[in-house]
Regions:
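Mixed-charge, polar/low-complexity N-terminal
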Residues: 2, 38-40, 102
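Surface-exposed beta-strand edges and their flanking turn/coil or helix-capping segments
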Residues: 52-55, 81-87, 145
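Charged, compositionally biased non-catalytic regions
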Residues: 1-24
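C-terminal charged interaction modules
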Residues: 116-157
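Compositionally biased, low-structure terminal segments
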Residues: 4-7, 38, 80, 85
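Generic low-complexity segments that are intrinsically disordered, proline-rich and/or Lys/Arg-biased
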Residues: 12, 99, 146-149
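Amphipathic, interaction-prone secondary-structure segments
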Residues: 23-72
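An exposed acidic His-Trp-rich patch
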Residues: 62-133
Length: 157
């Protein structure tokens, strides 16, 4: 499933509403180095998909690198079981809630960043509602009906 940054379609909103967490020098939060950790949202850009998931690429202000990629599904396990009909129990469990994305490279700080998400952001109801709103906005641009008059003509034989 392809994912695209929310920023790519809504740059001004993303600039204003992307969440970051500051870890101070002596705080030792989850053994993370002092930095601001920005949680950049990415959503599925496959037409017709309704996975209700977000991937956070977490970028450190110190390294300017992606330190973790967290997948988060906010719906129930029953929702994901119906959505992914042929998935195993393990597949379904991985779709719901936060986890490090297994197919993305992760830094040595990824586990600590995941705990930071679980302890702070996942429990912030207004933030999770904002992510859901961003998902709906993004999906509306992916799933909007196409004008048949704008279709390209096929050429060749």
């Amino acid at each position: 499933v392809p994912f695209e940054l929310f920023y790519s379609r809504f740059p001004e909103i993303a600039k204003a509403e992307t969440r970051s967490i500051s870890v101070l020098e002596n705080s030792r939060i989850n053994r993370l180095p002092a930095a601001d950790y920005g949680f950049m949202e990415a959503f599925c850009d496959e037409p017709g998909c309704d996975c209700r998931r977000v991937f956070f690429s977490v970028i450190s202000s110190q390294t300017k690198q992606i330190e973790a990629v967290i997948a988060y599904g906010w719906k129930t396990k029953n929702f994901y079981r119906n959505w992914f009909k042929y998935g195993t129990d393990e597949d379904i469990a991985s779709l719901q809630g936060p986890e490090l994305n297994l197919s993305s490279p992760q830094s040595k700080h990824a586990e600590g960043i995941l705990r930071l998400f679980e302890e702070i952001l996942q429990n912030d109801k207004s933030y999770i509602e904002r992510v859901k709103r961003h998902y709906k906005m993004f999906r509306a641009t992916v799933d909007k009906p196409r004008n048949p008059l704008l279709r390209r003509r096929r050429t060749g034989g």
